[in-house]
Amino acid sequence: AALYRIIAHYRMTDLIDTHISLRVPDQPDCFLINQYGVAFEKMRASTLVKINHEGQVVESYEQDKPVNMAGFVIHSAIHDAHPHLNCVIHTHTADGIAVSAQKHGLLPISQHAMKFYQHVAYHEYEGVALSTDEQERLIQDLGDHRAMILRNHGLLTAGETIARAFHEIYFLERACQAQVKALSGGAELHYPAEEVRIKTAKQFASPLIEPILQRAWQAALSLIEHQYTEYAS
């Protein structure tokens, strides 16, 4: 619930149409996802729904409240295929959609973008993800990456922890924002050398980054500390 509110704090919401999921630690075949229709800004622990990989509601504080079907299709596919990925975040931000619609995709023109150099996947748009038929292609396209650009649709990141998934979506979103602004200026872009791009990506992939992810998550969490009694209920 806190992660939903943090995503809202950073203005990465789209009414009620995006989703975040978290695997239940002692029930690996189940994950928590938002109750469809609740604004991210108002998310509480009690408005999360526990569902299994077949889409069956295992536990819900409010009975007969739906989950987003597209959310189930996308998130269950990733949780099922990648047992190590416990948190999945999907967004529809304006800049994320803009980059997803650009033929060249994400450009290595910022430090944020170079984190993903050769480490971001792409998935072609097939319409609203309401069919489980799309799951196999989604997983094939994701491969072993933690970040994926859904063409003409938005962004998706995943991680072993909430901190990792959040750091991925934050950096991917910032990379897209920088790209849209840079391209809108009309001037010729400067690209760092290939070896610098590779070096930067390796730096972000280093195990030494893990404590930084945790600190970043705690810093983000502190921004909504005053809402604790709400989102924890």
Language-model segments: residues:
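Glycine-rich flexible loops
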Residues: 1-233
